[in-house]
């Protein structure tokens, strides 16, 4: 009897144990990452040929204690390697694990290699050559603490390499994991199986091989026992011949069918090639089809299984499309596949909840480093009275109501950018802004007392409902998370896409960027203030301080300002402002852009302006500014400097976003200035619920 070890992906150990026992293995013992078992020589070959779940089959050769590199060398050399290798066999060493002595796996592999080679030269035998790419024998050494375990890898290449894969699509799953997913899906061979996001077809191919009794090792060309001196070629040929016979019989007798589709024509072509190479191409129908086009290919079949490994996102900007995808799949299952089963394998359990289905079973497994879950669902048969469940129904109803109200208003106003929803319902704490045919959803970060999983699920529901109510394509929705801003964080760069969208605001054309920054380049709540500036600017010299992307300057220029001066500390935003001005034909010497610390520039400037707009930050301690700035504390000093630049009869429009801001009217009077609050006049319909989003003042000479 041979003592053997079969490795597998985390979470599949018990499934592998059952498989090995069915092959005839005895004394099976599950450990993390695999199964120890015993069997005769025939079982060695059967496990290699027939295991769908094992990553590798190892033949343990011994263990040794490693307190020094010499211990490792002597421990390896103690094994009778000359009786292990066929003459002329090449070999390679795979070494994993470190300890205080062996701190580099390459060094460990070198010591093992030296010990094996020296075992031959000491007996005056030809030394075996190393072949890292295609060795006849693979030696595996695993070092854990002070113990090194040495084994022959009888698999050669990993057993997931069945020999049928042409080229993988994006983010494939290994064939061994795919087989486990099929086994756990609840699908019964002989019934229909469909994968609507099949990629290169791995799940369907593994299922078809299982259903037709086709051994997973049948198409492999190389094995790790080819240079093993104890290899029994006669038994191996018997095992191989039996597998070939069973495969022919299984294919001839199988009558059901498999269906796969994917939106990518290139991966569908690969899937067809893979299925043909696997010998089961005639059983699988592959189509280029988006999930939105999914229909039941066998509507008269009482039951079948939909099985898939849908995409998941690691980046925030991919989530809206994925949420929409899962929501859509859930609706299609209910409408088209009543009575069928659904099984999905995913690294994102939150996305699976968007199906709006209740799972009957779930399994955990690893896909490489990713923690994944497989959930099985039974889809109830629909009845004429069945009504689809609405996701986030209260939110959807409010958004629908707001859409009806604001869409017509915005069209009449001549604006393309407006707020559709502003945390109207406390439990749905987001802002939804429309930018032409795009939508930005800003999640206000939930307090730490709220369960993170529940908050994420609520956000997913919001996104699904937003896409549904507004009827937009998922890739037209941008998701952002907004936390309380500190200093310059409001200008934090989020991405590098550099994609700008042209929008209109009254008679102005403006560039917005929906993805690269937390803000888009256009503060929607200041829309009316910008229009007022345009109406006030004819024939005047206009100054815009803390100008951001210069949208107020554009309105002033279009309103007939004699000159405009735009000042901001950020080169990025000044370049953006220049693009906005150019887009509206506002170029030349009359339109200056100045990169400077606005407060420092203000103290030193000696020019005169008729109309000044200033929208400073609530607080700033930027390293590029000379002093920290607090708008409540410092606004009077700001007005003192502004007065010096204000031409007789001129006006300052002063705005800020500090909640509870109190204008120092007495202090202003001492400066010879007076203030008129116009906050309510600058709040449009879409910000009527948020009266404190900003405050705005007109300041003139007393």
Swiss-Prot record:
Family annotation (Gene3D superfamilies): 3.30.2130.30, RNA methyltransferase domain (HRMD) like, Vaccinia Virus protein VP39
Range of residues in the leader sequence: none
Nucleotide-binding listed as a keyword: no
Domain THUMP, chain residue ranges per copy: 43-154
Enzyme class label: transferase
Enzyme Commission identifier(s): 2.1.1.173, 2.1.1.264
Catalytic activity entry: guanosine(2445) in 23S rRNA + S-adenosyl-L-methionine = N(2)-methylguanosine(2445) in 23S rRNA + S-adenosyl-L-homocysteine + H(+); guanosine(2069) in 23S rRNA + S-adenosyl-L-methionine = N(2)-methylguanosine(2069) in 23S rRNA + S-adenosyl-L-homocysteine + H(+)
UniProt xrefs under Pfam families: Methyltrans_SAM, RlmL_1st, THUMP, UPF0020
Principal cellular location given in the protein's record: cytoplasm
Keywords: Cytoplasm, Methyltransferase, RNA-binding, rRNA processing, S-adenosyl-L-methionine, Transferase
Record GO cellular component, one term: cytoplasm
Biological function: Specifically methylates the guanine in position 2445 (m2G2445) and the guanine in position 2069 (m7G2069) of 23S rRNA.
The family this protein is said to belong to: Belongs to the methyltransferase superfamily. RlmKL family.
Name of protein: Ribosomal RNA large subunit methyltransferase K/L
